[in-house]
Amino acid sequence: MNIKQLVYISKATEPFTAASLKQLTDVANANNAKLNVTGCMAYSAGYFLQLLEGSAETVDSLYRKIEKDTRHKGTRLLLEATVDEDKRLFGKWFMSSFNVDTTVDFPAELKQNITEIINDRKAIIPVHRLFMEFRKHLGQ
């Protein structure tokens, strides 16, 4: 069976604290569990970079809902791909998140790559590989 992977970036309308990021992640985790959607969300320099994985119809519907969320603006789609179910990157997590800015041991190359994406420049690491690196860093 195939699933859809979708990656987007957006700018937070207000700064997110560790507590507000955890609250957002907890809600996403509960909602995504019901939808069989998995993924990862990175927060850096006031931006969200998120990967969603699941059935194409569900991911598309969820993305349309996310685009309307007032906690962020300037949603920009970076990647849409159809992959085999066994290529799901975050199968153990309905939603994982982390704050790149406060993660002490986060690799400098990955931070630089996020900055390149935020500034709409060609990323050093393709966005799909970036999430593979996130997965390694998060220990999945």
What positions do the PLM features span?
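Charge-rich, low-complexity N-terminal segments
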Residues: M1-Q140
